[in-house]
Amino acid sequence: MTARGNLFIVSAPSGAGKSSLISALLKDKPADMQVSVSHTTRAPRPGEVNGQHYHFVNVEEFKALIEQNAFFEWAEVFGNYYGTSRHVIEHTLTQGIDVFLDIDWQGAQQVKAVMPEAIGVFILPPSRDELERRLTGRGQDSQEVIASRMAQAVSEMSHYKEYDFIIVNDDFDTALADMRAIIRSQRLTGASQIHAQNDMLNDLLAG
């Protein structure tokens, strides 16, 4: 019997390395893991593929999906809507595939409200100085924008206590190993093993 997959909520302030960690986890395209593909009303950027990077829909379609209670969570960001499909995630989990949601603390709260068993992982930078260095090192933003991003990061980090696991991304390889350890540990819980090893357990206990 295939054990149900786990839903992992991964949140972090900008610059903490969340996207890089998720990309590294999925680099070899493991059959038992995938990142959730969100719906959005924003226009596709160059190189983005519908169904791979996002499900691109118009505002009317998105609002219809809201009315149908089709999203685990949704939000409006800078005039564009983003949402996580309830049906797609449920279907994927029943196939024994772990799903990763790359969302902020507000989205995490919405998901936890409807799926309390979802596992929250928060990625932190090792220090404020290092976070600012990473944000500045991108060389793409003005000091005003960096200051705004730092303030937003502090606000995001204030919600770390709402998560089940905390990873400090001081060394990338160590942080990646920590992430893999969390995933492995969740697959070895009693509930997961009862499903995965049901036939063996019944055989062991047969009179």
Swiss-Prot record:
| Main location class | cytoplasm
Q: Which CDD domains match?
A: GMPK
Catalytic activity, EC: 2.7.4.8
Q: Is Mitochondrion one of the keywords UniProt gives this record?
A: no
Localization (cell): Cytoplasm
Reaction catalysed by this chain? GMP + ATP = GDP + ADP
Q: Which residues form the Guanylate kinase-like domain?
A: 5-184
Coiled-coil region list: none
Can the keyword Cytoplasm be found in this entry's annotation? yes
CC annotations in GO: cytosol
Q: What does this protein do?
A: Essential for recycling GMP and indirectly, cGMP.
Could you tell me what this protein is called? Guanylate kinase
- Gene behind the chain: gmk
